[in-house]
Amino acid sequence: MNIYLIGMMGTGKSTIGELLTKELEYSFVDLDEKIEKCAGKSITEIFENDGEENFRNLESEQLRFYSNSVIACGGGIIMREENRTFMKENGKAILLTASPSKLSKRLIQSDSRPLLSGKKNKEKLLKNIWLKRRLHYLNTADYTIETGHKTHEEITNEILRHLD
């Protein structure tokens, strides 16, 4: 069984994933890192040179390679029905959430997020992305955790309690 960490960029999926693997006998997989390694270029370069559709194809392929892993998924992975179905059939999906203003503060200096690159009003853009993805996140998630005012340890422990 896999544990899929889903949610918007900046919710802490990679950080929480690494903490979870210290508590569980699972490997940790950051899908974005695996995609970059496979493609030989950054996510931003993939978006710029090959387009979002090609990135989403790589993402869907990488999702299927792992078992008994904690997988930090890219924020948009839930936009494809095939990915939502695969996660439901092969593990538990944990949705990490935070308000657009909290995410904007966390991501203010980030240049590695192609959907935010060069954008002025990141908070408004994040809110629009959330509204577009919200139902897919909620329908995919087996459990949801609001991360805005919790420590990494509190979030990790809440997930572990839910998995027991």
Language-model features and meaning:
Residues M8:
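P-loop (Walker A) phosphate-binding loop of NTP-binding proteins
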